[in-house]
Each structure stands twice: as structure tokens, then as C-alpha cells.
């Protein structure tokens, strides 16, 4: 249910679709421009360069007049010319293998100096192809089968690109679950909620990435087939020649992308939860993803810095630990990690971060049994935000079946007090205690089942979801038995239940939020400016609905500047005077408006 809501939010966000289109375009670039496969391209380029150099310096003498070195050069030139003139891949492969084998002899004897590692990788590639009986060598991106397209597309794109979907999903879903949002108010253990958010980010990020890869993958599959699992790949890794297959690389790359996405998701959610800063986690994850591109973290730096080797950087540039078809790299960022160790390091970090998440979301145990009396009670408290304390409260008690009003000018701290009472903002209460029916607000999941705050802003509503979807989520999350149809009919919101809330007027949104509060079945409702933006008829409808809930035994605390309506609804009031909360009982000799004017000397 919770994950379903988050995935709906992702699916309906335009940024997600834009990101997917950008990914699809970026991964399709090699095919669109028919980029050469650098292995065969550089093999032929190297051979052609050798032939040109040989022809320039070749002596006119022949046969026995040539020195052994000149004879070797002539033999190399013959193999190179044969490879360059080959009409089939099999003929090219046969001549190329002989060319690189002779080059290898020259390296061993010392008669040839240069890039031996690349020559060794090219020779291993040719021999592996010959021994496997595979003679098809892709020359350009349009020749790649499905199995080879994924690694090549990942290699051709910037290393951070495949992980953008996970970063974007993290930002969107952490924003959708920040304090005061509907998802944040849902009663659930904090660690379970953390896991659900992480899972939703992984699912959304993976779906975006696969959708971005789909056009190129489908094109490669349709044009060149699935490919051969045993197609050889050769490259130097950590100073040693490594040979593997296209099937192994494909699997490792997929696992690395998933491991990297999981690491981003967990890091983003845990750090944002621990710091209570929505963007702290995604920012840290973005730095990790971008790190392989930093000069400081180059292969030479990693080779001399044990601390940097402990970072899970290789998983964010997996192609450099796996190689890919036709490419013979000899240097790597994170060269100390092979495919298996790269994945292992990433998963260790995931496990550690989950452990940190379990610690930071742990709720303290209730100190002794819950008190037997009923009511919402804030005692001996100071309330504030940031580094500022704005209210001192001796006692605020809301007993079952009562309605109380909160009255004060703008800027006095009404919203801060209501947020403190909701339990959703634990840092709002600097000292003192808050409990509902004896359940401390520190027991966040149990407390959320009892107390619901309907905020004055738009945080309660998601613009892309309909009113009905909000109400359905509320009913399921709070395990409510509320009759949604009857509730909507009584408030007059049935005609626009299927509209996205961004298309509703301010008054309509107010009524939807009131319906959501009622639908929770929470015994204590805290309503911040629930009557703002309503015409007289709708105000009466909303007041009747609140009065009906009080008659059913629910308690309501209402903040409003509409004093006449507030006076009709409530039988006690709380005023904020000079930073202190003062309770005043309803008087028959003085109206609430007169009381307000006397208290604030002409203030609102």
C-alpha cells in the first residue's frame, strides 16, 4: 500500500519521463552514429600504421640481404596487409592472430618495445575467438547483438548516467515523504517505512534505467539477434591479463547497476533520515556517483591510497572492472576491484547503512505501562523551531469528545504548536512530555494511530493524485472503517473525487483535507485553518461535519481566524499571550471576538 502510493507519485512525475527519454537518447547514440567498435578499429589502425612505417623505411634488398629484425618486420607487414585486405572476419582473424603472435615474440626478445599489454590482450582475444569457433567480429555499434549492446552502451555513456534514475527517484520520494506530508503521517514503524522508501526508489530507478536501455536493446536484438554467451572478452585488470565472456560481463554489469542503485537508494534515505535534511542523502550519493570522474580518484591515486580503495567507487564505473566486446583497456579507476569484489564491497556498504538506519529510526521503549486516563496531553513543555523557543506551555489537555479552539495573531506560533502536538515534528518540543491516551509521542507509530494533523498548507495533498486516491490511501493506512462514499457525500465533494488535486480550488482542497482527517478514524484531530477559503455554505457544511465527529466522541483542536464559526464549534479556547499558552473557558457574557480584541488590543 505504502509502496504503491510512492510508485504512483513517481509514475506521474514529468521529471521521470524526461529522464527516461534522455537516457534512451544517450544510450542510442552509438547506434545512431554507428560508432566504431574501438577494438577492431584500433587493431586495423595499428596494423595500418605499422605497414605505413615499414614501407617508409623498408630497404630495397630482399631475402638473405635482410637482417633478422628486418625479416621479422617484413613478416609482420605481410600478416598486417593480409589482415587489412581480408574479405571475411575469419580471414582477418587468422592473419591478425599471426601478426600479434609475432609481435609477442618481438616483445619477449626485446626487439620490439611499446604497449605490450594491449598486444597481449589483442592476441588473447584472437586466440579465444579461434578456439571457440566464433569468427564474427563486430566492427561498429550497428553490428552488436543484444548481449553486447548493454556493456557497450554503458561504456559509451558518462559513467554517472545509469545512476541518474536512482538519484532522481531518491530526491522525488524523499520529498514526498518529508515531515507534514501524507506519507509521513501514516502510522508505521520508522524502520519499516525506511525499507519501503528504499524499495520504491530501487524499483522506480530500475524501471527508468531499463526503459532507457530498451530502444537500443530492442534494435540490437531485432537486427543482430541475442548474441553468443561465450563470445570472448580480453583486457588487463590489476596488472594481469583477464579473459572472460560476453555472458559473464552482461550479468556482472546488470548486477553492478542494481548494486549501485541499491547503494544510492539506501545511502540517500538513511543519511536524509539521520540528518533530517531531505537533500543530504541524495547529495552524498551524487558525490559517490561522480567520484570516479575526479582526477584525485584516478587509478594512480587509488593505487597509493588504501583509504580510497575502501570506498565503493568501482560499482559506479563497472565497465572498467569487466571490459566489453572488442575493447582492450589497460588502466582502470578502481583497478583493485574485480567484478566479484566490486559487488561485495557495495553490498557491505548497503548492509552497514541499513544497520545505521535501524539505529536512527529506533523508537525508545515506553517507560512503564501507558497511563489509564484518556486524552491528548502536553505538559510542562517549551516549543520552538531551529534554535528558537517561542512558546512555554504549562498544560494543554484535550479530553475525548471535546472541541477546543486555538486563537492568536499570525506569527504567534500557532502552526508550530500544532506541529508539536501532531508528533510528526519531534524537534518542535524542546522539553516536557506529549502523550495521547498515555502513549508517548516517542512511540511514533502508535501515536500516529491516535493523532492526525491536517496542515494549513498543501503538504497533505499530492498534486498528481486524485482526491479519491488520497482518501483510499488514508483508509487503508490507518485501517479505518470510514464509509468514504457517505463521508464525501456529506461534505459535498463527490463530484470532483476523480480530479487530480492540482485542479481543485482552494475551498475544494480544504474539504478534501477535512475528509481525509475524518477518514483516519483517529480519536484526536488537529486542524490548522480548516475553514479558510470556504464560502459560507461550505463553512457550515464543514462545521457540521466537525460537530458530528465531536458528538461521536472524537476530540478536535481547531486553529482559525474565523472567530464566529470557532465560537459555535468549541467550548474552550487557547490563546497565545507573550509566548505563553493560556486556556480560557467559553463565556456567555463576552463573545470570542471581544475576548480576542481585549487580549491582543486590536490585533487580528
List where the protein language model places each region.
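The feature captures the beta-strand-to-loop junction immediately N-terminal to the Walker
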Residues: 407-409
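Conserved ABC transporter NBD signature motif
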Residues: 430-447, 583
Amino acid at each position: 500500500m505504502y509502496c504503491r502510493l510512492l510508485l504512483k507519485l513517481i509514475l506521474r512525475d514529468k521529471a521521470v519521463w524526461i529522464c527516461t527519454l534522455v537516457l534512451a537518447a544517450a544510450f542510442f547514440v552509438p547506434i545512431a552514429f554507428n560508432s566504431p567498435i574501438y577494438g577492431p578499429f584500433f587493431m586495423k589502425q595499428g596494423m595500418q600504421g605499422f605497414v605505413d612505417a615499414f614501407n617508409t623505411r623498408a630497404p630495397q634488398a630482399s631475402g638473405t640481404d635482410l637482417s633478422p629484425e628486418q625479416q621479422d618486420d617484413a613478416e609482420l607487414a605481410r600478416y598486417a596487409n593480409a589482415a587489412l585486405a581480408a574479405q571475411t572476419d575469419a580471414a582477418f582473424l587468422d592473419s591478425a592472430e599471426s601478426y600479434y603472435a609475432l609481435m609477442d615474440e618481438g616483445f619477449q626478445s626485446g626487439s620490439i618495445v611499446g604497449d605490450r599489454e594491449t598486444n597481449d590482450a589483442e592476441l588473447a582475444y584472437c586466440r579465444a575467438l579461434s578456439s571457440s569457433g566464433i569468427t564474427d567480429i563486430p566492427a561498429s555499434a550497428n553490428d552488436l547483438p543484444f548481449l553486447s549492446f548493454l556493456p557497450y552502451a554503458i561504456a559509451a555513456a558518462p559513467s554517472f548516467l545509469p545512476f541518474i534514475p536512482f538519484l532522481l527517484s531518491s530526491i522525488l520520494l524523499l520529498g514526498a515523504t518529508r515531515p507534514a506530508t501524507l506519507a509521513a503521517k501514516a502510522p508505521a514503524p520508522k524502520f519499516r517505512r525506511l525499507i519501503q522508501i528504499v524499495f520504491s526508489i530501487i524499483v522506480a530507478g530500475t524501471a527508468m534505467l531499463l526503459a532507457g536501455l530498451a530502444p537500443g536493446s530492442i534494435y540490437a536484438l531485432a537486427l543482430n539477434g541475442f548474441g553468443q554467451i561465450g563470445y570472448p572478452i580480453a583486457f588487463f585488470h590489476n596488472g594481469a591479463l583477464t579473459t572472460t565472456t560476453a555472458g559473464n560481463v552482461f550479468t556482472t554489469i546488470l548486477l553492478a547497476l542494481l548494486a549501485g542503485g541499491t547503494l544510492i537508494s539506501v545511502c540517500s534515505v538513511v543519511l536524509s533520515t539521520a540528518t533530517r535534511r531531505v537533500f543530504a542523502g541524495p547529495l552524498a550519493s551524487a558525490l559517490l556517483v561522480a567520484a570516479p570522474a575526479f582526477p584525485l580518484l584516478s587509478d594512480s591515486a587509488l593505487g597509493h591510497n588504501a583509504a580510497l580503495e575502501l570506498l565503493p567507487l568501482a560499482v559506479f564505473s563497472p565497465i572498467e572492472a569487466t571490459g566489453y566486446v572488442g575493447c582492450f583497456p589497460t588502466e582502470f579507476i578502481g583497478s583493485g576491484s574485480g567484478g566479484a569484489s566490486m559487488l561485495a564491497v557495495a553490498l557491505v556498504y548497503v548492509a552497514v547503512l541499513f544497520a545505521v538506519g535501524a539505529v536512527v529510526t529506533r523508537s525508545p521503549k515506553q517507560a512503564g505501562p501507558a497511563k489509564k486516563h484518556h486524552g491528548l496531553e502536553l505538559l510542562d513543555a517549551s516549543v520552538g523551531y531551529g534554535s528558537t523557543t517561542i512558546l512555554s506551555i504549562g498544560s494543554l489537555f484535550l479530553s475525548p469528545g471535546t472541541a477546543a479552539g486555538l486563537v492568536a495573531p499570525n506569527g504567534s506560533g500557532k502552526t508550530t504548536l500544532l506541529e508539536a502536538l501532531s508528533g510528526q515534528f519531534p524537534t518542535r518540543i524542546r522539553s516536557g512530555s506529549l502523550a495521547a491516551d498515555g502513549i508517548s509521542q516517542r512511540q511514533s507509530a502508535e501515536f500516529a494511530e491516535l493523532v492526525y494533523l491536517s496542515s494549513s498548507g498543501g503538504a497533505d495533498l499530492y498534486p498528481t493524485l486524485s482526491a479519491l486516491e488520497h482518501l483510499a490511501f488514508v483508509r487503508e493506512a490507518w485501517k479505518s472503517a470510514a464509509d468514504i462514499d457517505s463521508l464525501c457525500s456529506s461534505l459535498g465533494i463527490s463530484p470532483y473525487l476523480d480530479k487530480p488535486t492540482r485542479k481543485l480550488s482552494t475551498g475544494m482542497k480544504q474539504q478534501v483535507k477535512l475528509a481525509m482527517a475524518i477518514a483516519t478514524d483517529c480519536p484526536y484531530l488537529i486542524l490548522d485553518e480548516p475553514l479558510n477559503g470556504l464560502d459560507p455554505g461550505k463553512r457550515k457544511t464543514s462545521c457540521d461535519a466537525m460537530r458530528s465527529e465531536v458528538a461521536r466522541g472524537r476530540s478536535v483542536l481547531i486553529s482559525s481566524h474565523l472567530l464566529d464559526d470557532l465560537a459555535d464549534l468549541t467550548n474552550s479556547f487557547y490563546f497565545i499571550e507573550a509566548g505563553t499558552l493560556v486556556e480560557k473557558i467559553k463565556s456567555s457574557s463576552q463573545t470570542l471576538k471581544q475576548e480576542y480584541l481585549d487580549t491582543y488590543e486590536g490585533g487580528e
